[in-house]
Regions:
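Active-site donor-binding segments of glycosyltransferases and PAPS-dependent sulfotransferases
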Residues: 32-99
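A charged, aromatic-enriched C-terminal amphipathic alpha-helix characteristic of glycosyltransferases
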Residues: 74, 313-316, 327-358, 363
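Membrane-proximal helix-turn-helix segments that form the acceptor-binding/catalytic region
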Residues: 84, 130-159, 167
């Protein structure tokens, strides 16, 4: 059986790319269709260890790193990609428009793994991506893109959600059903660390939607120590407002992150995630999580056993959660064991079984 994968774009290596790598490995993918490939060679080898894979790009390749400015044309260009008619199985990994790739043969099976709320900038209700005035000006275009996105969501034969949170979003937004298969987390490469030190840690991109500003404001009111690992557009602002008990560490490599996360009292996360890989990695070290009780983290954190929740994105709510956390005696080994259900091997086994069952059904 000839197989291909469709992805939105290839630029940086992260959680979404780990999923792509696993899919490629499981199904021995031969061809990757994408809007654009601007990923460096080192990262590309992580995604596709098999150097024989063919990467086919769209016209957007001409725009290189400026391609995001043409976001309103993404649905058009994904539709224009022509999958080889000899391909029998298409698996799309979609956080934007990859699900919209069209079959070129009625006998093809298209299964889409929905990595996140697709094209979040279209469906954003919190005003994170566009200010109110800009959103009003763009509303005719955004409304049209919503209709196209909903239509393209019906292109796959089957949808898989990466969390219950995303599954509910798919149902609410596209009026479609989906199965849940949690994404692969490299928990096997994290070791249990029982000797915790006197600091909290957060690791993420320093962007507005991650709400690191709320974590900083909470620790400004606290005597607890905080280490922030990451970079982004808010870095200078966060450093400016941070008190002396808050330290910033630039992300250099995974061993640096592991060293800080494994020894931390707790990992703190204030953003609403579709799944949230970093908090699961923290738990793989035996490090409890303090997180917003919304999004995918509701599924990966067990209240008072593997972490503590706060209900609203508010600095006082975070501070109150820290105070509750300090009164709980956590079992680090239990936390580590709970993280193992999100292993890469579990993901690969469940996805393989799902695809096999759909192929078998299709042949009946």
């Amino acid at each position: 059986m000839k197989k291909a994968i469709a992805v939105d774009w290839l630029d940086k290596y992260g959680g979404a790319e780990r999923v792509i790598s696993s899919i490629t490995k499981i199904f021995q993918i031969e061809t990757c269709y994408t809007l654009i490939n601007i990923m460096n060679e080192e990262d590309l080898k992580k995604v596709f260890p098999n150097n024989n894979i063919k990467i086919k790009n769209s016209f957007l390749q001409l725009f290189k790193s400026k391609f995001r400015y043409l976001f309103f044309l993404f649905p058009y260009f994904i539709k224009k990609i022509k999958v080889d008619k000899s391909v029998e199985l298409i698996i799309s990994s979609s956080f934007s428009v990859a699900k919209g790739i069209k079959k070129t043969n009625p006998n093809q099976i298209h299964i889409s793994y929905i990595q996140a709320r697709n094209q979040r900038y279209l469906w954003d209700k919190e005003g994170i991506y566009f200010g109110k005035k800009v959103r009003v000006l763009l509303s005719p275009i955004l409304n049209l893109l919503k209709k196209i996105d909903t239509k393209q969501a019906s292109n796959p034969d089957y949808l898989i959600a990466n969390s219950r949170f995303v599954q509910n979003w798919i149902k609410e937004t596209y009026k479609m059903s989906s199965e849940i298969i949690y994404p692969p987390v490299d928990v096997e490469n994290f070791k249990l660390q029982k000797n915790k030190e006197n600091y909290f840690v957060t690791v993420c991109r320093l962007e507005p939607y991650k709400r690191v500003d709320l974590i900083v404001k909470a620790f400004n009111k606290s005597k607890e120590n905080l280490i922030i690992i990451g970079s982004g557009s808010q870095e200078n602002y966060l450093k400016k407002i941070a008190a002396n008990n808050i330290r910033f560490v630039e992300y250099s490599n995974s061993s640096v992150v592991y060293n800080y996360v494994s020894k931390a009292k707790a990992f703190i996360h204030a953003g609403i995630e579709d799944f949230g890989i970093a908090p699961v990695e923290a738990q793989a070290c035996g490090t409890p999580v303090i997180a917003i009780k919304k999004g995918g983290l509701k599924e990966t954190v067990i209240e008072n056993k593997t972490g503590v929740f706060f209900k609203e994105q508010d600095s006082n709510a975070i501070l109150e959660a820290i105070n509750r956390f300090n009164k709980i005696d956590f079992n680090y080994e239990f936390i580590r064991n709970e993280s193992l259900k999100y292993s890469t091997s579990n993901f690969e086994s469940k996805l393989n079984d799902f695809v096999k069952s759909k192929i078998a059904n299709d042949k009946r």
